[in-house]
């Protein structure tokens, strides 16, 4: 229902009041800015959620997205590797934690609103009128003990409209006084909630006033109801779930009442929102010039009370205003003409929310991006190390097999001699033991009378077992001593290597390891085998049984001491030591051959399984490098850039300092507390360049600060670049004096140049220690400060080794030959340093002759691949020349490590710069 009230315009007329058009315009600008950035943040969150949905969708069915969902399922290695390349145990780390997602969703869904609290209803209405710049609410009749002001909400609409609505925004169909006729301010009877009303819903309903006003187009305004009608804490509780409240508290007295203090204490107890305290001028009073007000250094009673309540800090100024870029804090304004401070306060409240949301979102991006990069390293290592492990396992098992076969062949004669020696030394002892032997399960008459054939056989068998057990122990000890040596030498490493290979297969079946154990069982478990009645024992038993069977008698003998010695004597004399040793070694070889063949077959099966797994791993590695990581890096760049622009605003471009292949470098006087700065403006032409830039930014921001690397201060995405025709990424970094190219042209002393070389090596070593490869080390990417100390810049081609795709990048004359094959590592930086060192030692920027003769890049690349290198100049020191040659060696494995290069350089510098002075033409310090 529409009322016939005053059709308030979209722009209030500027009047003498403190809430003039200037304040309203600033508020509109601030809330409009918040909505724009909130829209970008909301879009980034939507893209992030879509990224994680796509990531979950790419996982194979049955693979849990988190431990809570999957439990113990999918623990087998074949089933716990998702299409992301990540084991199931780590999938929870690359998911969007539900609590964080819910919190961020709530943060971006909450639109701002201005909430007006106050000492009484009259002063709240007065502040509302000041904010809108027009008289909307009556102020002279409200307030007092009997006031029952309901909650009021002011929203934007093309027509003026007044209605009642429940808290869930359902509109009540009630006839209001505002509907009855013409009015200038909202009728009082519509503002008050009458408790004697028969309709309970009408008492709880809020009055919604829709009007065409510039400020309401950006933000809703809510006037809190009377404390007696509903506590302020309850009002705030309703609001915070759907809105971000910018809380104002209207004052008209010089001090807070006890009820006011209690209300503020309750708010502080349950909420952490800052509050803008504003002392509203008395009705009809003139605005007093601030020069006649209390001196800033004096603290008013209100200020002291609010300080005691914890809202204000004694370290802030009298108005309680914090600095421009600090976290939002409560503020007290007692001069009515300073309502403009509400702009600063609201800016800080809104900015704090945006920065917190952007920071939380960026943390999710960075955490998951780091996991992807670490997983890329793990996958790359897996691809490199698994074939080597398989080859090592095959080689070592073969060595073990051959060693054990040699033992079997070599030990046969030793066993024969050992058996003869053992029998000779133990013969009397064995005969005595046999004579004194107490038979088991055989009843021998005390008078020595003959017993039956069955008992005789049992007695003979027990005597045989006694002799064999003693002999077996000696043979076992001989074999065990040999195999234990093998076990100590390399079997342990072989077992560990097998375990790591079998980890990625079915954990319940380690067939290959079992066959390895069988190979060893043939020897070092011989003691257990002999004592448990192995085939060797049975073979010995059969051999001795044949000997014993040749002993004949006419009638069963008497079981006497002499008979037992005779049986043992004949058994010992009838044993053939050579045949026994040959049989033992033959059976040992048979076992070895059987286990070796089974091991080889199972290893081939294991290798086939790994071959399929590695093929999938390589696909996953490519997906992480080409899709997952770049996509997430772009989201991270957007969220971090949003955070930077909120905190430090967009930087101002100064004069152009230089141009590169992908961007322009400008001077930037100051940004984010850094002075002076350089600003690199990059306009990515396509998705690939966007992704490369985003990853570059992540690597640079992730690096710890280092004195040999140029600092990156931050980034801002400029959506209005080129008049809005394109989007540019502005990278704000440390500004230095000049680059090495300019320095060499101007002239640098030898000691200075060698120190620069040391600085460059230190910087590259640091990058390598972080797993990064620069890939574009050259004169113009080495910057010098005013003391001519060097820092490496332009990490545009810098990537972790595991994230490199083999693309050909860099500057032609500094590019190592293997770069053209697409297979390279961090030694390409050593090559590039060798070329850079040639320039440093030459002291000029003149191209080497071998490169100067090349008519094109292709010609240059072909010459480099054929071995073309810079020539030796007469001024070169022998050790310097040898170092250059070593660095640009065509074989990457022959290039020295930078940990070796650095002390060599230091030695060269100490020798050349301390032993003799510079030549006149080479010792010119740069005077600029």
Curated annotation (Swiss-Prot):
GO terms for biological process: cellular response to fibroblast growth factor stimulus; negative regulation of apoptotic process; positive regulation of ERK1 and ERK2 cascade; positive regulation of fibroblast growth factor receptor signaling pathway; positive regulation of kinase activity. Keywords: ATP-binding, Cell junction, Cell membrane, Coiled coil, Cytoplasm, Kinase, Membrane, Nucleotide-binding, Serine/threonine-protein kinase, Transferase, Tyrosine-protein kinase. It is found in: Cytoplasm; Cell membrane; Apical cell membrane; Basolateral cell membrane. SUPFAM superfamilies: Protein kinase-like (PK-like) (SSF56112). CDD domains: PKc_Dusty. Pfam families: Pkinase. Residues 1-14 have a biased composition (Low complexity). It catalyses: L-seryl-[protein] + ATP = O-phospho-L-seryl-[protein] + ADP + H(+); L-threonyl-[protein] + ATP = O-phospho-L-threonyl-[protein] + ADP + H(+); L-tyrosyl-[protein] + ATP = O-phospho-L-tyrosyl-[protein] + ADP + H(+). GO terms for molecular function: ATP binding; protein serine kinase activity; protein serine/threonine kinase activity; protein serine/threonine/tyrosine kinase activity; protein tyrosine kinase activity. Its main location: cytoplasm. Its EC number is 2.7.12.1. Residues 1-22, 55-81 are annotated as: Disordered. It comes from the Eukaryota. GO terms for cellular component: anchoring junction; apical plasma membrane; basolateral plasma membrane; cytoplasm. Acts as a positive regulator of ERK phosphorylation downstream of fibroblast growth factor-receptor activation. Involved in the regulation of both caspase-dependent apoptosis and caspase-independent cell death. In the skin, it plays a predominant role in suppressing caspase-dependent apoptosis in response to UV stress in a range of dermal cell types. Belongs to the protein kinase superfamily. Ser/Thr protein kinase family. This is Dual serine/threonine and tyrosine protein kinase.
């Amino acid at each position: 229902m529409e009322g016939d009230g005053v059709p308030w315009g979209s722009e209030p007329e500027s009047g003498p009041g403190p809430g003039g058009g200037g304040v309203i315009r600033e508020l509109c600008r601030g809330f409009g800015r918040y909505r724009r950035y909130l829209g970008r943040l909301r879009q980034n969150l939507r893209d992030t959620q879509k990224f994680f949905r796509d990531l979950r969708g790419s996982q194979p069915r049955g693979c849990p997205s988190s431990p809570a969902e999957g439990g113990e399922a999918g623990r087998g290695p074949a089933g716990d590797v998702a299409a992301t390349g990540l084991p199931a145990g780590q999938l929870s780390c690359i998911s969007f934690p539900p609590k964080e997602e819910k919190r961020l969703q709530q943060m971006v869904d909450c639109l701002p609103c201005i909430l007006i609290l106050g000492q009484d209803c009259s002063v709240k209405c007065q502040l509302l009128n000041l904010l809108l710049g027009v008289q909307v609410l009556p102020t002279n009749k409200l307030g007092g003990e009997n006031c029952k002001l309901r909650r009021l909400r002011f929203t934007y609409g093309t027509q003026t409209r007044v209605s009642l609505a429940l808290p869930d925004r359902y509109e009540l169909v009630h006839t209001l006084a505002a509907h009855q006729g013409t009015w200038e301010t909202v009728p009082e009877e519509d503002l008050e909630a009458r408790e004697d009303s028969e309709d309970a819903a009408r008492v709880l309903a809020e009055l919604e006033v829709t009007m065409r006003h510039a400020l309401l187009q950006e933000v809703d305004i809510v006037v809190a109801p009377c404390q007696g009608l509903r506590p302020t804490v309850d009002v705030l509780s309703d609001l915070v779930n759907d809105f971000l409240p910018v809380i104002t508290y209207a004052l008209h007295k010089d001090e807070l009442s006890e009820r006011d203090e209690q209300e503020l204490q309750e708010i502080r107890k349950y909420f952490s929102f800052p509050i803008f305290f504003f002392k509203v001028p008395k009705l009809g009073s003139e605005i007093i010039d601030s020069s006649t007000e209390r001196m800033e250094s004096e603290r008013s009673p209100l200020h002291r009370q609010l300080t005691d309540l914890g809202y204000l800090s004694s370290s802030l100024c009298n108005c309680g205003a914090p600095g421009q870029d600090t976290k939002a804090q409560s503020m007290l304004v007692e001069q009515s003409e300073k309502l403009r401070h509400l702009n600063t306060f609201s800016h800080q409240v809104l900015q704090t929310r945006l920065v917190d949301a952007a920071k939380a979102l960026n943390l999710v991006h960075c955490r998951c991006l780091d996991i992807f990069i670490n997983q890329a390293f793990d996958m790359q290592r897996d691809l490199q190390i698994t074939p080597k492990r398989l080859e090592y396992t095959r080689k070592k098992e073969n060595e073990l097999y051959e060693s054990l076969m040699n033992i079997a062949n070599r030990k046969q004669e030793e066993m024969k001699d050992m058996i003869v020696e053992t029998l000779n030394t133990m013969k009397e002892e064995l005969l005595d033991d046999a004579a004194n032997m107490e038979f088991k399960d055989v009843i021998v008459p005390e008078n020595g009378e003959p017993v039956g054939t069955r008992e005789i056989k049992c007695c003979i068998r027990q005597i045989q077992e006694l002799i064999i057990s003693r002999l077996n122990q000696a043979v076992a000890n001989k074999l065990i001593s040999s195999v234990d040596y093998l076990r100590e030498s390399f079997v342990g490493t072989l077992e560990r290597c097998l375990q790591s290979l079998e980890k990625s297969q079915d954990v319940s079946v380690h067939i290959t390891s079992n066959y390895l154990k069988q190979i060893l069982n043939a020897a070092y478990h011989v003691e257990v085998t002999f004592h448990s009645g192995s085939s060797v024992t049975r073979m010995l038993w059969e051999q001795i049984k044949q000997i014993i069977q040749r002993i004949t008698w006419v009638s069963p003998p008497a079981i006497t001491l002499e008979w037992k010695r005779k049986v043992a004597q004949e058994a010992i004399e009838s044993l053939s030591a050579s045949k026994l040793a040959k049989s033992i070694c033959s059976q040992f070889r048979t076992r070895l051959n059987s286990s070796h063949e089974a091991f080889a077959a199972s290893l081939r099966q294991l290798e086939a399984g790994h071959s399929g797994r590695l093929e999938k791993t390589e696909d996953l590695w490519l997906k992480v490098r080409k899709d997952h990581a770049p996509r997430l890096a772009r989201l991270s760049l957007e969220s971090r850039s949003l955070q930077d622009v909120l905190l430090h605003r967009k930087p101002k471009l100064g004069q152009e300092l230089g141009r590169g292949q992908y961007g322009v470098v400008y001077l930037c006087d100051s940004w984010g507390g850094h002075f002076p700065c350089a600003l690199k403006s990059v306009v990515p032409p396509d998705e690939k360049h966007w992704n490369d830039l985003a990853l570059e930014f992540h690597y640079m921001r992730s690096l710890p600060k280092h004195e040999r690397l140029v600092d990156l201060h931050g980034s801002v995405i400029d959506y209005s670049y080129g008049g809005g025709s394109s989007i540019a990424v502005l990278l704000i970094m440390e500004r230095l004096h000049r680059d090495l190219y300019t320095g060499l042209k101007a002239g640098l002393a030898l000691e200075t140049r060698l120190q620069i070389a040391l600085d460059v090596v230190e910087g590259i070593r640091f990058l390598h220690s972080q797993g990064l490869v620069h890939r574009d080390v050259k004169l113009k990417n080495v910057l010098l400060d005013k003391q001519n100390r060097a820092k490496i810049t332009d990490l545009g081609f810098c990537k972790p080794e595991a994230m490199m795709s083999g693309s050909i990048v860099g500057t032609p004359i500094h590019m190592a030959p293997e770069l053209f094959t697409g297979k390279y590592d961090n030694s390409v930086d050593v090559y590039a340093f060798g070329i850079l060192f040639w320039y440093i030692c030459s002291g000029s920027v003149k191209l080497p002759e071998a490169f100067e003769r090349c008519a094109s890049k292709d010609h240059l690349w072909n010459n480099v691949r054929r071995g073309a290198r810079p020539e030796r100049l007469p001024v070169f020191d022998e050790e310097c020349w040898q170092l250059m040659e070593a660095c640009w060696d065509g074989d990457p494995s022959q290039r020295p490590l930078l940990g070796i290069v650095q002390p060599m350089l230091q030695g060269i510098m100490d020798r050349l710069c301390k032993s003799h002075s510079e030549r006149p033409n080479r010792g010119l310090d740069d005077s600029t």
